[in-house]
């Protein structure tokens, strides 16, 4: 097609270069190595359980959900805002027991601060420092609604909120 400065360049789909995507996985076929994302779903559909299973899998190099292999094992850091620390401990212990793991041997860390607000500069700074110290492979912050006071329906607000997290907070 001739070059025309008034139009955008186009090419037939069949003429596009064929190249398989080069994805690096943290958890094969489930979560990308440098991914920042949200586990979404209806209330009470086990989103928190999935996130915690992912964290335990990364920390222990055991398959997530018994199926998805961990490609980059390492420490995991979690903040579960809706659960008491004893409840978090009990959940992790139950997952460990199911997998035959010793909880004391895991690089699974829990933020014990009662509240974390990603829309506050001080909390962002403290999270950045924690991430720099622990260098986790996976950070789980659950649930998003308890981590800010912004408009969840505003893509701009949520993007500003998650951008520092994606950069290692």
Pin down the residues of each PLM region.
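Conserved inter-motif catalytic segment of the P-loop NTP-binding fold
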Residues: 4-6, 21, 26-27, 63, ...
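The conserved Walker
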Residues: 43
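Detector for small/aliphatic-rich hydrophobic stretches
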Residues: 1-18
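Short hydrophobic/aromatic beta-strand immediately N-terminal to the Walker A/P-loop
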Residues: 37-40, 77
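Conserved glycine(s) of the Walker
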Residues: 46-47
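Hydrophobic positions on the alpha1 helix immediately C-terminal to the Walker A/P-loop
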Residues: 50, 54
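Gly/Ala-rich phosphate-binding loop of Rossmann-like dinucleotide-binding domains
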Residues: 59
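Pre-Walker A (P-loop) beta-loop-beta motif of ABC nucleotide-binding domains
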Residues: 33-34
